[in-house]
Regions:
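N-terminal capping segment at the start of a domain
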Residues: 1-29, 120
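Generic non-transmembrane alpha-helical segments
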Residues: 4, 8-11, 15, 38, ...
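Midchain, well-structured core segments that form catalytic/ion-binding scaffolds
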Residues: 121-122, 128-273
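Glycine-rich, flexible beta-strand/loop modules in the N-terminal catalytic cores of phosphate-handling
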Residues: 19-29, 46, 220-226
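Active-site metal-coordination/substrate-binding segment of hydrolases
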Residues: 40-44, 53, 58-154, 158-160, ...
Length: 273
């Protein structure tokens, strides 16, 4: 029902570390755990068999007439970027939950198991690995890869998960043969549907991310006494690189994009860099 969906959205938005400044809910933080437990509780209320799977992924299963057959899966993530929006990930989680409620309430028969799932650390804002939870569950990466990373408190993914009181109950890898179909409902992450007055779209491809850390070294010298012709200003070089990349990428295909996410200047003082 619309009322339940609205209540779910409001509940999720209350689990937020930055009220008034967007939604911040990083993996295994107190806000995240509150949302995590909310999902588990709602699934249990409608009779789901809830299992904490590899990487802390939630799976709420409704067995169906043939419990051994591949599952029809739906869900998303509940972690956010810093100061993010109220719907990213939440929409996919809530729609899967609400669909399961409707199936249960109306006693709709289904042959295949229905799985409502939640993947941790999909945004990568907590531990720096995008699609971390789903990649771990499906065997795309080894646990050692994500455990080389740490959150702002210095905890690895596994340490933070255990500190939050989450215990994996099924550490097996999710295989392609385990899934009949997967559906994730998602918000429009651009303006295309709105501008084109289209109500819904189906994804045909997704951005392939490539992260690069660039270190530009200059020479520090007296800010007032050093002529411009003798300066090697690292920040000025960085600005040229950023502008140059923007120009190059704008000439490529329409779907290509670039983002400069973070800058750090050392020393961050009013001197030549």
């Amino acid at each position: 029902s619309k009322d339940r969906i609205q209540n779910d959205i409001e509940a999720f938005n209350a689990f937020n570390a930055t009220p008034g400044h967007g939604i911040t809910r990083l993996t295994w933080t107190p806000e995240y755990i509150s949302a995590y437990r909310y999902v588990i509780n709602e699934l249990k209320q409608i009779g789901a068999e809830v299992t904490i799977c590899r990487a802390g992924c939630i799976r709420g299963r409704f067995p169906g007439d043939d419990p051994s057959s591949p599952a029809v899966m739906s869900g998303s993530h509940i972690d956010t970027v810093l100061n993010g929006g109220p719907f990213d990930g939440v929409v996919g989680t809530i729609t899967a939950l609400e669909a399961a409620r409707v199936v249960v309430e109306n006693d709709i028969p289904h042959r295949h198991p229905i799985d409502v799932v939640v993947f941790p650390e999909e945004e990568g804002s907590g531990f720096g690995m995008v699609l971390g939870g789903s990649s771990l569950w499906t065997g795309g990466i080894d646990p050692e890869e994500i455990d080389r990373l740490a959150n702002v408190e210095g905890l690895t993914f596994d340490e933070a998960m255990r500190s939050a009181g989450v215990t994996v109950e099924n550490d097996s890898i999710l295989r392609a043969g385990d899934i009949k179909a997967m559906l994730e409902v998602h918000i429009e992450q651009s303006v295309v549907l709105d501008r084109e007055n289209i109500s819904i779209g189906i994804i045909e491809s997704i951005a392939g991310l490539k992260w690069c850390d660039l270190v530009i070294e200059g020479i520090a010298n007296h800010a007032g006494g050093t002529p411009m012709t003798y300066r090697r200003d690292a920040l000025q070089g960085a600005v040229r690189i950023i502008a140059g990349l923007c120009g190059e990428i704008c000439e490529l295909r329409q779907q290509t994009a670039r983002l400069r996410g973070e800058n750090a200047i050392d020393p961050d003082l009013p001197v030549n860099r």
